[in-house]
Design a protein with these regions (language model features):
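N-terminal "arm"/small-domain region of PLP-dependent enzymes with the aminotransferase-like
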Residues: 2-55, 61-64
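Residues at alpha-helix termini
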Residues: 24, 68-69, 119, 170
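Residue-level detector of functional hotspots within protein domains
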Residues: 12, 17-19, 23, 60, ...
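Conserved PLP-enzyme active-site core in the AAT-like
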Residues: 2-3, 74-187
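Conserved N-terminal alpha-helix of the aminotransferase class I/II PLP-enzyme fold
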Residues: 36-85, 107-114
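Generic N-terminal initiation segments characterized by hydrophobic and/or small/turn-forming residues
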Residues: 9-11, 58, 157, 169-170
């Protein structure tokens, strides 16, 4: 089940992305607590090998989040910093520039200061509640705009639609860190 306008968020939260439990035919999808999964042969899995990589419970969660957000896919991480780090390591390279909201989590600031800057990725800390300031911060080397709204702990708001328009105009990725907003198409 995916969001197509017919279902309320509460229905999607219960049934969205529903995965059939072929293991025990449970009505509510079970939580798999195993660390490792049986393999057909060494290095050949039946779908999952190790829970730190993937497992049926996480698959079901990702499908449910995708349904709630109205997108065909979602990826769940163990922590917000794991998600942010993966985003940047997968999308930027030496010489690239990133615009970062001036109210992001301190761990994100340290990620740039202690790791990404050392890899040659520059960043500009910008008051993203000031749309014109974001536009001025874009350079030919900019690849991503990272915002957090409402900002934590300031509660400063950024106009997601306005920043998304800047990102589209310059062919940039837009990442929105979310501490306070609910899931379920909170951006609509």
């Amino acid at each position: 089940m995916s969001y197509d306008g017919k279902f309320q968020v509460s229905t999607l939260a219960i049934h969205g992305g529903r995965v059939s439990d072929t293991h025990a035919e449970a009505v509510v999808f079970p939580i798999f607590q195993t660390a490792t999964f049986e393999q057909q042969e060494t290095g050949v899995t039946k779908g999952h090998s190790y829970s730190r990589v993937s497992n049926p419970t996480v698959d079901a969660l990702e499908q449910a989040i995708g349904a709630l957000e109205g997108t065909p896919q979602a990826v769940c991480f163990r922590t917000g910093m794991a998600a942010i780090t993966t985003l940047f390591l997968a999308t930027v390279k030496t010489g690239d520039h990133v615009i970062v909201s001036d109210v992001v989590y301190g761990g994100t600031v340290r990620l740039f200061r202690e790791i990404l800057n050392g890899l040659g990725v520059s960043n500009s800390s910008v008051d993203t509640s000031d749309v014109e300031a974001v536009e001025r911060a874009v350079t030919p080397l900019t690849r991503i705009i990272l915002i957090e709204t409402p900002g934590n702990p300031t509660m400063k708001l950024t106009d997601i639609a306005a920043i998304a328009a800047i990102a589209r105009r310059h062919n940039l990725l837009l990442a929105v860190d979310n501490t306070f907003l609910k899931i379920g198409r909170a951006h609509v």
